[in-house]
Amino acid sequence: MNKQSWLLNLSLLKTHPAFRAVFLARFISIVSLGLLGVAVPVQIQIMTHSTWQVGLSVTLTGGAMFVGLMVGGVLADRYERKKVILLARGTCGIGFIGLCLNALLPEPSLLAIYLLGLWDGFFASLGVTALLAATPALVGRENLMQAGAITMLTVRLGSVISPMIGGLLLATGGVAWNYGLAAAGTFITLLPLLSLPALPPPPQPREHPLKSLLAGFRFLLASPLVGGIALLGGLLTMASAVRVLYPALADNWQMSAAQIGFLYAAIPLGAAIGALTSGKLAHSVRPGLLMLLSTLGAFLAIGLFGLMPMWILGVVCLALFGWLSAVSSLLQYTMLQTQTPEAMLGRINGLWTAQNVTGDAIGAALLGGLGAMMTPVASASASGFGLLIIGVLLLLVLVELRRFRQTPPQVTASDS
């Protein structure tokens, strides 16, 4: 059979027990983090009535994640990766307990929320980097595209479920329940991760960590193909920072606390559909052009989002953004793995993830600032259409990425 299915092949979960353990742990972790992601902005909005303060919390956490990714890349290449993953997860859980205790105080501390956001952002990113570095050893380099799509599906499905649960918890029990369940879920993820095999770092000459990072930066800047992919990823992540406007837009649409969860769930739902129907993406002849066009469509969806007269139509726009961004992100991931030398894969993956975090932090800060000067509707639309203009310029400038062609892999009877 030579016809490739549109649907994602989930066979890796059956054939690779270690990857199955990571799948389970990641799903539980994403559900836990989703509860946190709903609670923090809503709590800050209630305490301060300021979109700028909400944006600041996201920016601070994003900055801590950037530093953590840089440090984590070095640790993952020097120390046993399973230990790094377990240490990072356990430390994050401690931070979530701190948020829960703070929320139970008669007057919760805004400073404590910011500081614990820095703590959790830093240590969470250590685990992310170690998992990225360990994935080829867990599934094999030939299965990276499939593993990436399954991972995205895991993340997105968890992100669909958790905001809805988080919204219901906010409406019934308050933010302390969100933080407490997030902490419990994070510690539960340690159980499947304990079953992972030892994941030693690859043998390589010892060099100063900064020198190693600089080599990765130089490669990224010198390669118009890989550098263009990283730039698109950062801009796409900037667009997703529109979530800092959700609480204010919810007031504009007169949404209930439970309905706010649908805003947070829309993008992950669209992305889950994109990952589930990604079976043919690896066989695209012109992945660079498809990546550029899907990114432009995602920016347009964000521009239209804030203009919708009803919140349900806004949810549809967010879901469309999620689907298009999933297509672009999967193509980014696959092309980075195939176009980056093996010796550079760890650093480039870390830098790619770090610039995505940076894009999110910058986007959150810009949207928070716009929200202080403009209406939430105008802020959302300005960000989407502004990124669309930049995207059109990149479509013209990134010639090598736009014209890149690949030979689709052959599909044999054993693959079907």
From Swiss-Prot:
GO terms for cellular component: plasma membrane. It is a multi-pass membrane protein. The chain crosses the membrane at residues 22-42, 56-76, 84-104, 110-130, 157-177, 179-199, 219-239, 257-277, 288-307, 314-336, 357-377, 379-399. It is found in: Cell inner membrane. Keywords: Cell inner membrane, Cell membrane, Membrane, Transmembrane, Transmembrane helix, Transport. GO terms for molecular function: enterobactin transmembrane transporter activity. It comes from the Bacteria. Its main location: membrane. Signal peptide: none annotated. Disulfide bonds: none annotated. The keyword Membrane applies. Residues 43-55, 105-109, 178, 240-256, 308-313, 378 are periplasmic. Residues 1-21, 77-83, 131-156, 200-218, 278-287, 337-356, 400-416 are cytoplasmic. Component of an export pathway for enterobactin. Belongs to the major facilitator superfamily. EntS (TC 2.A.1.38) family. This is Enterobactin exporter EntS. It comes from Escherichia coli O127:H6 (strain E2348/69 / EPEC).
